[in-house]
Amino acid sequence: MPQNEYIERWTKQHGKRLDHDERVRKREARQSHQQSKDAQNLRGLRAKLYQQKRHAEKIQMRKRIKAQEEKNVKSSAPSEPSKTPLPQYLLDRSEATNAKALSSAIKDKRAEKAAKFAVPLPKVKGISEEEMFKVVNTGKKTHKKSWKRMITKPTFVGNDFTRRPVKYERFIRPMGLRYKKANVTHPEMAVTVQLPILSVKKNPQNPLYTQLGVLTKGTVIEVNVSELGIVTAGGKVAWGKYAQITNTPENDGCVNAVLLV
């Protein structure tokens, strides 16, 4: 048994108090009074956090109540079939329609959609601006101007990228830290292929890093998967798919990613 389950272990060894159930019932009955008291008397940040917590609880409670109230509503079908011909799209009207089954199907579709965009690394460690940028001092003689920044992490820039004039370039992306290809692993096919990067979709650190094309751990990139021969539901060959970077490119010297399928 794990070390932190000592209360459960003690209960298994010695049993519960004789009035345990009664005490639990009374504690639950007092809970609503305590919640009301807290809602009325808490002030400041504690009140704000408490209201957020209660708001989330109420939403979950309403969802549960709504799920329980769903009835099996069936459409009334005519007793005798009509002799007049019906078009194809009206033929299923005569069949009984189960409302609960329909709503469940819609919920399943939504859950599938949410799972479709689930990523292998949901949380990543934050990177400070001091670590991301190096201050570049400029100025003709004094070098006192320090508005330029050099990016110290790997980046991606497209083929059509052209640098701004040096005088106006605020963010410098070194050529040695630019990557054009990524080692992408397909989780279902269990193969790793080197694919060209098309764009940086989302950097979890900062929207500015997404705009600059910074490649850090957890970044979602778009890769060209035409070599894999992946076909969409419509029968067309998929061109670009999203993948998430799973390694630390500045340490490894390469970009490793997992395809989001």
Curated annotation (Swiss-Prot):
Query: Main localization of the protein?
Result: nucleus
Q: Where can the motif Nuclear localization signal 1 be found?
A: 15-22
Q: Where is the composition biased (Basic and acidic residues)?
A: 1-31
Motif window: Nuclear localization signal 2: 52-59
InterPro entries, per database record: NSA2_fam, Ribosomal_Se8/biogenesis_NSA2
Q: What superkingdom does the record give?
A: Eukaryota
Could you tell me where the Basic residues compositional bias lies?
51-65
Protein's GO biological process: maturation of 5.8S rRNA; maturation of LSU-rRNA
Tell where it localizes.
Answer: Nucleus, Nucleolus
Spans annotated as Disordered: 1-87
What does the annotation say about its assembly with partners? Component of the pre-66S ribosomal particle. Interacts with nop7 and rrp1. Interacts with rsa4 (via WD repeats).
Q: Which family does it belong to?
A: Belongs to the eukaryotic ribosomal protein eS8 family. Ribosome biogenesis protein NSA2 subfamily.
Q: What is this protein called?
A: Ribosome biogenesis protein nsa2
